[in-house]
């Protein structure tokens, strides 16, 4: 089947949605950027700039709208809303879609209430659409400014994944296509939780050695869970797995790292900045347990977030686990 994507819609006009609209515009596509809030849409359309990305002008080929039906007419649609709001956004969009329209989830997480991955949510909320997932090491500000970035885009059909990559790729944004949808989703969800752990380590001033150990052992957990779901090794060690983990464990530009940093310092969580890992942690632990997978770092994060254990007690418990061979 031939896929041609000249028009791209982005549903969600936050920083990441606007950055991805810029990506599609640089790739030569005609872009519709949908904002649910009318005032926000007017501000962006009038200033030709998103206040969440100051100093970065919108390309002329980006049209800002509050008309969801207009967005639904695009050849492919990027859904750029938080993971816990994905179902609602897709349900509103579903009746307006042509059969087979690709819906690309651009959130990293697991639906808290159902334990469903992002493409599973899309499949349930819009059965006539074709789900896909975009993930990888990418901060909105870097992407919006046109700094070199590489990500993974996965869909069940390789031809579709390849066509979407061709539609979005440019000299500054390099997507790799894959059919390992679940592997990509697991990498994105797990790294959010591990980034909170990395932030806690940094907030506690436990040192670079501890951060390196945490990141490495956390990655081992990500790999174990991925293998239990049949993920490919090249996905887990690729951009959407190891690559994204490295980025989000590296500094406070990551919302999940920033949340962990605040926890480690004994400060309130950052206001107005959603850290998906807060929702994902308990779900990830339950999914791991259902597959017989040990994830002690993720368990520690979930316990800290729920208030059932202190940070110091969680760290001590991790360090006092039985000694064993590295795997």
UniProtKB/Swiss-Prot annotation:
Q: Name one GO biological process term.
A: glycerol-3-phosphate catabolic process
Catalytic activity line of the entry? sn-glycerol 3-phosphate + NAD(+) = dihydroxyacetone phosphate + NADH + H(+); sn-glycerol 3-phosphate + NADP(+) = dihydroxyacetone phosphate + NADPH + H(+)
Provide GO CC annotations from the record.
cytosol
Q: What EC number is given for this enzyme? A: 1.1.1.94
Classify the source by domain of life: Bacteria
- Keywords on record: Cytoplasm, Lipid biosynthesis, Lipid metabolism, NAD, NADP, Nucleotide-binding, Oxidoreductase, Phospholipid biosynthesis, Phospholipid metabolism
* Residues annotated to bind sn-glycerol 3-phosphate: 108, 136, 138, 191, 244, 254-256
Similarity field:
Belongs to the NAD-dependent glycerol-3-phosphate dehydrogenase family.
Protein name per UniProt: Glycerol-3-phosphate dehydrogenase [NAD(P)+]
Protein's organism: Bradyrhizobium sp. (strain ORS 278)
């Amino acid at each position: 089947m031939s896929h041609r994507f000249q028009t791209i819609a982005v549903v969600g006009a936050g920083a990441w949605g606007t950055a991805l609209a810029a990506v599609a515009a640089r790739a030569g596509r005609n872009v519709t950027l949908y904002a649910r809030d009318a005032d926000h849409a007017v501000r962006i359309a009038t200033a030709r700039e998103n206040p969440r990305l100051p100093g970065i002008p919108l390309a002329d080929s980006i049209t800002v709208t509050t008309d969801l039906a207009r967005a639904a007419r695009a050849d492919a649609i990027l859904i750029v809303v938080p993971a816990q709001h994905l179902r609602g956004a897709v349900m509103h969009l579903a009746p307006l879609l042509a059969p087979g329209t690709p819906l690309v989830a651009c959130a990293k997480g697991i639906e808290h209430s159902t334990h469903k991955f992002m493409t599973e949510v899309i499949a349930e909320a819009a059965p006539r659409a074709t789900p896909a997932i975009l993930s990888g090491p990418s901060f909105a500000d870097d992407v919006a400014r046109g700094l070199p970035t590489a990500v993974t885009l996965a869909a069940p059909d390789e031809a579709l994944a390849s066509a979407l990559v061709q539609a979005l790729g440019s000299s500054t944004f390099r997507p790799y296509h894959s059919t390992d949808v679940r592997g990509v989703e697991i990498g994105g969800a797990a790294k959010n939780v591990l980034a909170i752990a990395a932030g806690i380590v940094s907030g506690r001033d436990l040192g670079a050695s501890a951060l390196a150990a945490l990141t490495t052992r956390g990655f081992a957990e990500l790999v174990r869970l991925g293998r239990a779901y049949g993920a490919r090794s090249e996905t887990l060690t690729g951009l959407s797995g190891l690559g994204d983990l490295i980025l989000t464990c590296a500094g406070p530009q990551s919302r999940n790292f920033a949340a962990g940093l605040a926890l480690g310092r004994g400060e309130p969580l950052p206001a107005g900045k959603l850290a998906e890992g807060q929702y994902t942690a308990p779900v990830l632990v339950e999914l791991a347990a259902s597959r017989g997978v040990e994830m002690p770092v993720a368990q520690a994060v979930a316990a800290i977030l729920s208030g059932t254990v202190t940070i110091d007690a969680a760290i001590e418990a991790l360090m006092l686990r039985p000694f064993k061979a590295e795997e």
